[in-house]
């Protein structure tokens, strides 16, 4: 249970931190993500997380993925996390 909670809560919270850093670097208030965060969390009450997953990795939108990886060129850690998460999302969406 603890390991699952680390993935479902601790890691997700850290992704909020990373997303906030990306916005704040551009002078954008990270609180703008709150409606999306709330909507995403609410969806899993009505459908599985797998069914609720959206985004370029699910669609395998290679143009968007490559553009966003390029935007992360100066931050290898975020770039690696983005690539690994995108790959995992894509693999799970095919199942």
Where are these regions (language model features)?
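Long, low-complexity C-terminal extensions of enzymes
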Residues: 64-66, 70-95
């Amino acid at each position: 249970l603890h390991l699952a909670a680390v993935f479902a809560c601790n890691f997700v919270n850290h992704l909020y931190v990373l997303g906030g850093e990306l916005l704040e670097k551009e002078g954008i208030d990270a609180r703008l993500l709150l409606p999306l965060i709330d909507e995403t969390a609410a969806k899993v009450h009505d459908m599985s997380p797998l069914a609720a997953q959206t985004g370029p990795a699910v669609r395998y939108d290679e143009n968007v993925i490559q553009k966003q990886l390029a935007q992360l060129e100066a931050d290898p850690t975020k770039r690696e996390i983005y690539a690994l998460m995108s790959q995992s999302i894509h693999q799970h969406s095919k199942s």
